[in-house]
Structure formats: C-alpha cells, structure tokens
Amino acid sequence: MRGAGGPRGPRGPAKMLLLLALACASPFPEEAPGPGGAGGPGGGLGGARPLNVALVFSGPAYAAEAARLGPAVAAAVRSPGLDVRPVALVLNGSDPRSLVLQLCDLLSGLRVHGVVFEDDSRAPAVAPILDFLSAQTSLPIVAVHGGAALVLTPKEKGSTFLQLGSSTEQQLQVIFEVLEEYDWTSFVAVTTRAPGHRAFLSYIEVLTDGSLVGWEHRGALTLDPGAGEAVLSAQLRSVSAQIRLLFCAREEAEPVFRAAEEAGLTGSGYVWFMVGPQLAGGGGSGAPGEPPLLPGGAPLPAGLFAVRSAGWRDDLARRVAAGVAVVARGAQALLRDYGFLPELGHDCRAQNRTHRGESLHRYFMNITWDNRDYSFNEDGFLVNPSLVVISLTRDRTWEVVGSWEQQTLRLKYPLWSRYGRFLQPVDDTQHLTVATLEERPFVIVEPADPISGTCIRDSVPCRSQLNRTHSPPPDAPRPEKRCCKGFCIDILKRLAHTIGFSYDLYLVTNGKHGKKIDGVWNGMIGEVFYQRADMAIGSLTINEERSEIVDFSVPFVETGISVMVARSNGTVSPSAFLEPYSPAVWVMMFVMCLTVVAVTVFIFEYLSPVGYNRSLATGKRPGGSTFTIGKSIWLLWALVFNNSVPVENPRGTTSKIMVLVWAFFAVIFLASYTANLAAFMIQEEYVDTVSGLSDRKFQRPQEQYPPLKFGTVPNGSTEKNIRSNYPDMHSYMVRYNQPRVEEALTQLKAGKLDAFIYDAAVLNYMARKDEGCKLVTIGSGKVFATTGYGIALHKGSRWKRPIDLALLQFLGDDEIEMLERLWLSGICHNDKIEVMSSKLDIDNMAGVFYMLLVAMGLSLLVFAWEHLVYWRLRHCLGPTHRMDFLLAFSRGMYSCCSAEAAPPPAKPPPPPQPLPSPAYPAPRPAPGPAPFVPRERASVDRWRRTKGAGPPGGAGLADGFHRYYGPIEPQGLGLGLGEARAAPRGAAGRPLSPPAAQPPQKPPPSYFAIVRDKEPAEPPAGAFPGFPSPPAPPAAAATAVGPPLCRLAFEDESPPAPARWPRSDPESQPLLGPGAGGAGGTGGAGGGAPAAPPPCRAAPPPCPYLDLEPSPSDSEDSESLGGASLGGLEPWWFADFPYPYAERLGPPPGRYWSVDKLGGWRAGSWDYLPPRSGPAAWHCRHCASLELLPPPRHLSCSHDGLDGGWWAPPPPPWAAGPLPRRRARCGCPRSHPHRPRASHRTPAAAAPHHHRHRRAAGGWDLPPPAPTSRSLEDLSSCPRAAPARRLTGPSRHARRCPHAAHWGPPLPTASHRRHRGGDLGTRRGSAHFSSLESEV
C-alpha cells in the first residue's frame, strides 16, 4: 500500500475528490434522458442549446469570488439560441508544469466549448501554455488579466488564444504619443533580461525609425538586478536622459527603483514609464483601493506613468463577462452556419487538430458586445483597444491623465508645461492658468499637425475650454487640442523660462477682450476677475475701466486707435496721353516751333547757294526736284517722332545746322514726354483720408454723399473710447459694427464698409499682410488715443513685479523689437513714396526752346558767311600750293578711311607704240529705248580690270571696283556695278575675240564722280544735219578690244547714243570698251598712214588746254548743225583702238575738281582723226586724251567753214602752210587781264592762263571751264599756248597746240549732246565726290 500510496498517495484522494465534486456540480449531463433532456436536441432553457464555458482562475485570491461568478456572468451574457452555462474553477498551482497538468485533467473530464482564464501571478509563462492548449484542443481561450496578456513567442498554428489586455507594442505606441505630445523627444530604454526584453527593444527601434518626430534615443541599459544597488546606480547615471522607459518583471522593479532613487534620478525633473503587463497597475491586483506598492513594500516614485486597458478598474465579474461574451458570440455564429455546436477536443494527449481549429478560428475574430468592438488581429490582441494613461500622484494614488480610443490620444491638461522648467511636476505654487484670445498676429490658433498630431516647435498646446475635473462626465465635450503661436505666445514662453513657472493655456469661450455687461465682466478680463485664470495675455488694451478690477503689467506694445480704409481703383482719362505737357507746351511745340523752324529751314535752303533754289530758278522740267515748305514740315515731323519715313534732306549748310538742332530738340522733347507719360497712364488709386476721430466725416457722416459707413468690433477698448468721447458717432456706427476683425476686412474689400476703426497695432499688421495690398491705414498708420497692450493679473498678484521686471528686461535687450520684426512686419508698406506727377509747363521746357532760338541766330550767321564766301571771297583766292596741299591731304584722309592700298613705285616709261590706222566701224541699227535709270543712280564708274582677263562684264566691273575702293558704296553706283552686260559682238553677230593680254596697269586714282542731269537727253540724230556721215569701216576689224576703265552714265530718258570716239584709248577714253556702245573695229584709214609718236606722258610736249566750257551757244550750235551730219558722226565714236601706252605712269592725281560742268563734253585728239575731208576742228592730241575729260558736244569753228561744208580755216600768222592755219582758226585769245581765268600749267613755267568767253558782237566769248576731275599733274603736261586771235560767231574755241606732233587730219565735230541745265556758269548739278566736294 505504501508503494502504491507512497508519494502519490496524498494527491490521489485530493484529485478524486475534486473530480467527484465537479461531476456532481456539473450542469452538463452525459446523456439526455429524452427529447426534453438537457443533453438532447431540445435541452436547455426554452429549447436553447447549452454553451459550456469554463472560468479558470489561477491563484488563491479568487477562491472566495469564484462560486458567485457563475449566475452573475450568465445573467450578464445573454445570447439568442444559446444557454450560457459558466463553470468557475480555481487552480492552486502557480508553476507552469502544475498549471498544464491541472488544465489538461480538467478538460479531459468536462465537455466545454470555451475557456476564460485570469490569474494574478503575472507570470510570463502562462500565455505560452494557454496558446499551446488552444492549438492542441481547438478550444477558444480568452485571457482577461494577468500574465496571460503577454505573448512571448509567435502563436501556434490553429490557436484561438485571444487576449483582452494590451500588448507591449501597443503600450509603447501610446507612450510615444504621450512623449510626442509634450515634446519629450530624448529618452533612454532601461530593461532587464526578463522574457520579452528583446521584443521591447525592437519595437522601440521600429517606432523611432519610422516617425517624423526627431526622436533622440540615448541608448538601452540592460541591468542585472542581482548585481547590487551601487552597480545599478552607476549604470543608471551613465546615461543623461530625463525620460526613462522601464521593462522588467515585477520582482525586478524594486531593486531598479531603489538604485534610481539612490542616484537621484526620481522625483522632480524625471519621468518613468513602466511597460509590460507585469508592472501595469502597480502593486497588488490593481484594485481601486489598493496602494501602489512594490512587492517588498517600497512605494513607487511619484510621476510614474503606465498604460492599462480602459477597464482596469472594473470588477472581476465584468472582466470575466467580457471574455464569456466573446466565446458566446463566436458560438452563435457557428450555430448559425452549421446548425449545431461542433464537438471540440478534450484530451491534451490526443492527436493535434490544427486543421479543425483553423476553420473555427475566424468565428471568434470580430465580436461586438455592449457597444464595444472586440476585433482581434492575427496575434490575438484587440485591433482597437481602449487604453488609458495613468500617473502616480503625490498622494500615492493612480490618476487617469489620458485615453487612447480609435488610435487617438486625448490627454488631460496639464501634466507639465512644455515651456516651464523642463519636466517639472505639477506644483500648485508655480503653475499658472493662462487665458488668451485669438487675434492675429498676437495670438494665432491653428490645428495640430495632421500627420504627427502634435504642435510644431514654435507653438504651444492650447485648449478650447477649461476643465478642472479629473473624471469628466460622459456627456461633457472633450477639450479640443489646438496649437497657439504668435507675438504674445513668444512673450509668454520667455516669461515662463525667465521667471520659472509652468502654465496651462486655454482660449476664452466668448471670444472677447472684456466688457462689463449688466454688471458682469466677460472675455479675458472676466476670466481673471472671477479667478478662473491666473493671467490673461493677448491684444489686451490697458484702459482706466479695466485697471479698476485687475492689475496690468507694463505695456509691451504701443498701440492706440487707427482707421483702415480700402484703396479704390481709379480710371484713366481718355486724354491721359496729352497730360504730360500742359496745353501751352503743346501749342508752343506744334503750332509755333514746328511751323517757325520749318519755314526757317525752307528759307535757308531756298536762299542757300547750294540749295534747291537753282532747280526752282533754272529747272526746265515742271515738277522737278524742289525742297518745298511741305517737305520741310514733313522732315521735322519725322524727326520728332523718330519715324523712318522717306524724307528729302536739305543741302545747304545753314539748313543742315537747323535740322541737327531740331533733332536734338526732338530727342529732349520725346524723352521728357515718355518719362512723364507713365505717371498719367496708370490707374490712380483713391484713398479716403481723415484727420482723426473728430473729423467731420466721422462726426457728420450723413452730410457726405454717399454717407460714410464705418464701424468697429464691440466690447473692446476702441468702442469704449468712442462711446465715452463721441456718443453721437457711437450711436451711428453701431449698425456697422463687425463681430471680428477678419469679417470687417472682408467688408472693407467688398465695399460694404468704408472705414474700420480698431487697435492700431492690429490694423497695421493686417495692412502689411493683406493680399494685394488693398488695405491701408490712413495717415501712414496714424494713431489716436495712444495706449498699450499689457498682461492682466489678479489684484495684488505676487506675479506682477516679476513679470514687470522681465518685460522691462526684454525691452532693454531689444527682444521685443526682434519679435515685432518677426510678427508685425509685412510686404505691404503704408509709407509709400509719393510720386509727384505734374504737367510739364513752359517753365519746365524753356531750355529747349531757348536752344532753338540760339540755333536760329547761329544759323543766320552761318547763312551770311556762306553767301559771303560763295559770292565774294572764293574768287579772290588765287591758285596756291596750300590749296593743293589741302586737297591732297583730304584725299589721303579718305584713302586711310577707305583702306586704299598704297600705289606701287613708278616704273620707267615704256617706249611709245605705233598706232594703227583707225578703221571705220560698220553702221549699226538705231538703238532701242534704254531702261529708265533714276537720277540719283546716274554715275561715273572708274576702275581697272586686269588685262587679258576676258571681255568686261557686270561682275567684273563690280569686283574691280570693290577690289580697288573697298566696301564703300557711293551714291548712285548700285545699278552700274551690279548689272551684267552681254559680251560684245561683231557685225556678223559673232562674239568678239577677247583682247590680247597686256602688261598689268597701275591702279587708277581713287576718285569717281556721279553726275545728275536735270532733263532727258535729246536723240543724237538730227542735231547737225550739215555733217555728212563717214564711210563705214570694215566689219572684220572689230576684234581688238581694250578693257574699259571708266564708264560715264547719264540719266537719260532717251536711248543711249552709240560709241562715237575716234580712238580706243581705254584709260583716257573710258567709254571706248566693247560695252560702251556700238560696234567698232580696228584698222586704219588711208592704208598705212604712219602715226606720229605721241609726246604725252613719257615726253610731254607743250600743249595748251582745250577750252571746253559750255555756253548758251550750245543750243544755237545744235540747231545750226543738221541731224543728218550728227547721225553720220556717230559711227566715228568706237572703242577698238588700243591705247598706245603699256601702263599709266606717274603717281595718282593729287588734285580733283568738279565734273558736273563736264557732263556734256568729250575730248578728241589730232592724230586719231579719220583721214577724210570736211568740217573739222583742231585738237591737242595729248590734252584730248585726258582720262575723265568728257568729249565736247561739237567742235566749233566759224560759220564760214560750216557753210562751206568741208572748211579750211586760214592759218595763223606764225604758221606756214595749211595746218598752222587750221590750228589758228580754233585758237582763242590768251590773256584777258580783267577777267578771272582758268589756270594752265606748263613744265617750263607755271604761268597761269586766265580767260573768260563772253558773247560779243559778231562772236562768242565763252567763260572759262570749271576745274575738272583731272589732276593737275596730267594738266601740267600741256604747254603754254601761243597767242590766238579771237574768233567770231557762234563757234567753239579751242587752244592751239604748237607742238609738231599734234598735226593731223581734221576731225568733224562729234555728236552733240544737248545740255539740259543751260549755262553751266549759272547752274550747279548734283555732283557727289568721293574725297572732296567743293566749288572753286
């Protein structure tokens, strides 16, 4: 018996007695006796199916209450269709092995559908045991309290182990919300090696790494409670953090807190948070009346925080009923789906039924009971648990300071002020309740950050109403968390830090500053007066009435009363573009100045010797080019407005000076107009101005039209001031008062309010921050009734003196000024720079008008000097070397500017070449009409082509010109240079052979001339009918072509005349090229008549200058000659005679003269006259070959010779034979001392020869020729002429050339080109010069 009853003997009877007691008391019969039995289908109350739930308690504390729980829980939990039958069982064993054995024995002897478990041991091993049993038997097990609320390992597969408590992760989440709410971002984690400490540290890492809050984790301390108090104290002091999160077993908490107290890490300034179910609720079972003591009896430190379930103060029956309700609601769902309650496992040693548990698990995951959500996650914890934050007070009781509902934390204010002394616990002597009122920029209220749910660092938490109760009633509104910042909030934070107090900030409910209504004060003043608040701060104005009931600090902001209005947009006048100048200036400008200056310019131009008066006086064509007064006005008008319109510029120097001064005047006029126009074109903004509150607009608003509408915010100091001083004004403005400042500003912008009267500090801020800067305070922020903002305190408060001293310190340290720049500044400024825009009057523009008057006076002086020089002084200037030097210097300056290449050194003259006999060109048909060429395009082109480069063309001409003259484009050369010309053709129509290659020639001088004619040329045929036509030369002789070096183009409306030159000197006769006109050929007349060697260039013989000056006899000579004779002379002008010299010798000409008087002349030569008889004139062979000397219209002799057909003039007395007589007949008197003469220089003596031809009785005395474009060096080769007798009759005079080499056959006079301008001595054409434009 001993062996059988040895050690197990005492346990056997006890176990048997327990099982018998359970069997006798069990409400679950093994088998139903009948249809109405308990076990049959119809068992239970009223046909409801029985639901057996085991209530298992572990610990001796539950023995007294376990027997009474069954009926109470069954009555609390009622489920339709189920008969809930709870059975309470108490387990004495506390170790894990004993607990497992007892539970397995219990389940094997009972048929239950669920288990509700609670223990008071808080042993961490209980949860894994229950989780294993649920997975093994598929029974739903609900843990409601104790150590079962901690899962140390992942749940077993198929387990339905559910927990109503909070997990470590959920507790840490709530704790971090509290830390974030109070800006406690720096902390340290303290843990022991208790089960679950690694999960605790990992959860902390997850929460801090993924948060937007800047957490400062100082590290983790892993303590060994058995190491001794000194070691623990040293470890706790090693980390300087005032927030500490503790995770340990309940037995390990006592040595940790003793070491912290020894190290001075508890009490004021330090906060401890306990994490884990074994520490939650403090000592004991957490009952409401149980003191929070450690297991050893030591008290917990004050200020300790913990997180518990919301029902932590509920009794045992209510906690158990919640667990039974979870099982009942899940069973009801099973019965609804399957129609019966499935049989669950009751044997712990049976085969695992995990697959069945997985299918039943989902019925218990989403439960709702008693208006509470019991939804569980995969770990078996509630998804949305209802938690509370409890704190240990000084009276050693737990206080609920916050709640956690639906993932939202709500805290009771205050715990400790964020901006008081750091983490000081609540001290009634140093804690203040502060009331404030929202009013920008002094107090700005904003919601909390939507992401983090906290206030940013420059703001503080503030609530909407005051709540002093610890446990507010359920129907009371919860305080809404807001964030306050602004100018006054920054001052409050500085005061709290300087003086050393904590505060609780809240907003007044009525939103007023303070006013006494029916004997009761409201607003912030009422909160302080009735002692609901210790202090009131904000835009609170100090006045006499308020100072009677409360004390005010020194003012920290100067303010008063100001008036704000809105800018109204103006309109732009239709005549705004005329407003920059006064009407007098406009009249002076366009009526007087423009007209007077235009008439002045026209008069100067008309009377100018170089102006358009010659065209008016001598123009043969009606409607010719004239500078009229209309053109003068048009020119000045275009200069005023900078319009690029076609205008005709004056030519006179005086007129040009006047136009230049007018242009300068126009620049000043237009610039002043443009600069002043912007001020008048903008929309002028209208701002109503008042002088103060006593202004007539405020005192008598009905007299205005429309009446002025103004108001203020009632119940403030502004309304009090107006009511006391201006009662009539107050009674009028009551209808326009606004409830808030923001609404008043909206009414101002909408035009429903004309003026708003309020505190100056607030209005100045609103004006600076207004969008669009449409609001402005009158008088640049003018303040009336100056006062200030102060802090309201109780009468006789002990805080007044410290606050006054602190505010004075802030003012002295410029902290207040810094805050004003931060909060009270804006982008809109009232002190706008006033732009004084006024019309420019005569006084403003007098200077430019004076300038015009001075310019007109100077122009008169220039005008007089110009006429004096032209008519008097220029004839008194004799030929001097100074003039030659000036002309040469002018040419050199032009050559530098035009990048003219330096001429190569002179080469020795080549031997003279024999001249071929001239061949008569074949007659050609009359030329067709030439295209019209504008007058300004008629030009003389001078260039040199490379010998042997082929026939001349348009491209070659342009290239040759630009190679020599550079990139300049002289007026009128555009048409001549760019036109391509066809290759010359012979009589048979075949192209002529290119000329033979010749040695390179020296570059020509840099000069050209553009001749402008006034009338179209007359047809050449029929001008001299008395001249017979010469015989045609052989056609085959038109092969030798010389390159044209100069082309003289006249502006003709008639077809151009054919070539008429009797020699082909390409340098002295520029139009003798193939393209110059007509077919030509080479060959000689008379078989092989030897040509005399020319004496020019290499050996210049004495040769007088040919007098080719036009005279009025041109028309008479043309009429005397028949058109047939002139037509017969046309073929004599061809260009197929080669120039006898290989190259031009000597430097370029150094002096140039006008060529406008030479437009109708061409030169001939004695030696190249065709050997035929008939009327002819004597020519100097060398002087006739001058380069730019035009050929004469005709060579004139006496009418006797003309009447005789082919004439033979008598020889002079100094000559013998026929030839000297011919030369004498064409001579002219050498000297006329009483008249100005043209100078002819000779190599021997440079004695000038002056003569002027005048018309006399029986003859013509022609005026001297104007100086030509020939250089004086070429003219110097002509010797002084011998005396000649004066000819009579309308004849052309010519110098005799006494040199022997100048003898030759006579030449009939060339084709006459009618002169369009009349007498060249009284006419000036439009000649343009490249290096010098002068008239001598």
Curated annotation (Swiss-Prot):
One of its GO terms (cellular component) is glutamatergic synapse. GO terms for biological process: adult locomotory behavior; brain development; calcium ion transmembrane import into cytosol; cellular response to L-glutamate; excitatory chemical synaptic transmission; excitatory postsynaptic potential; ionotropic glutamate receptor signaling pathway; long-term synaptic potentiation. The modification Omega-N-methylarginine is found at R1316. It is a multi-pass membrane protein. Residues 1-27 form the signal peptide. Residues 630-641 dip into the membrane without crossing it. Changing V667I: In DEE46; gain-of-function mutation that potentiates ionotropic glutamate receptor signaling; mutant receptors are activated by lower concentrations of glutamate and glycine and show slower deactivation after agonist removal as well as decreased sensitivity to allosteric inhibitors indicating that NMDA glutamate receptor activity is changed. The modification Phosphoserine is found at S1326. Residues 981-991, 1035-1044 have a biased composition (Low complexity). Residues 1074-1089 have a biased composition (Gly residues). It is found in: Cell membrane; Postsynaptic cell membrane. Residues 902-932, 992-1006, 1091-1104 have a biased composition (Pro residues). A motif (PDZ-binding) lies at residues 1334-1336. Gene3D superfamilies: 3.40.50.2300, Periplasmic binding protein-like II. It comes from the Eukaryota. Keywords: Calcium, Cell membrane, Disease variant, Disulfide bond, Epilepsy, Glycoprotein, Ion channel, Ion transport, Ligand-gated ion channel, Magnesium, Membrane, Methylation, Phosphoprotein, Postsynaptic cell membrane, Receptor, Signal, Synapse, Transmembrane, Transmembrane helix, Transport. Its main location: membrane. It catalyses: Ca(2+)(in) = Ca(2+)(out); Na(+)(in) = Na(+)(out); K(+)(in) = K(+)(out). Residues 631-650 are annotated as: Pore-forming. Residues 1225-1240 have a biased composition (Basic residues). A hydrophobic region that gives rise to the prediction of a transmembrane span does not cross the membrane, but is part of a discontinuously helical region that dips into the membrane and is probably part of the pore and of the selectivity filter. Component of N-methyl-D-aspartate (NMDA) receptors (NMDARs) that function as heterotetrameric, ligand-gated cation channels with high calcium permeability and voltage-dependent block by Mg(2+). Participates in synaptic plasticity for learning and memory formation. Channel activation requires binding of the neurotransmitter L-glutamate to the GluN2 subunit, glycine or D-serine binding to the GluN1 subunit, plus membrane depolarization to eliminate channel inhibition by Mg(2+). NMDARs mediate simultaneously the potasium efflux and the influx of calcium and sodium. This is Glutamate receptor ionotropic, NMDA 2D. The gene is GRIN2D.
